[in-house]
Amino acid sequence: MPKLKTRKAAAKRFRISGNGKAIRRKAFKNHLLQHKNATRRRRLSQPEVVHETDQERVKLMLPYSF
């Protein structure tokens, strides 16, 4: 059986936490930040756990991470 390939685009966007859940970065934090208040910018800086319905898809894209 051949080795499974990792989706490199997914590998750059997700990392796996200690308890086996995928972590992602939030959107809307790259530019056009001057009209967003500090609270919103701070919240957008926090990493987010990938939703449980998408965890299975991330797991397929990163076969050796879990």
From Swiss-Prot:
NCBIfam families: rpmI_bact
Keywords: Ribonucleoprotein, Ribosomal protein
Family: Belongs to the bacterial ribosomal protein bL35 family.
GO cellular component: cytosolic large ribosomal subunit
Molecular functions per Gene Ontology: structural constituent of ribosome
Classification lineage: Bacteria, Bacillati, Cyanobacteriota, Cyanophyceae, Synechococcales
GO biological process: translation
Superkingdom of origin: Bacteria
InterPro entries found in the cross-reference section: Ribosomal_bL35, Ribosomal_bL35-like, Ribosomal_bL35_CS, Ribosomal_bL35_sf
HAMAP family assigned to the protein according to its UniProt record, in alphabetical order: Ribosomal_bL35 (MF_00514)
PROSITE patterns named among the record's database cross-references: RIBOSOMAL_L35 (PS00936)
Gene name of the encoded protein: rpmI
Protein name in UniProt: Large ribosomal subunit protein bL35
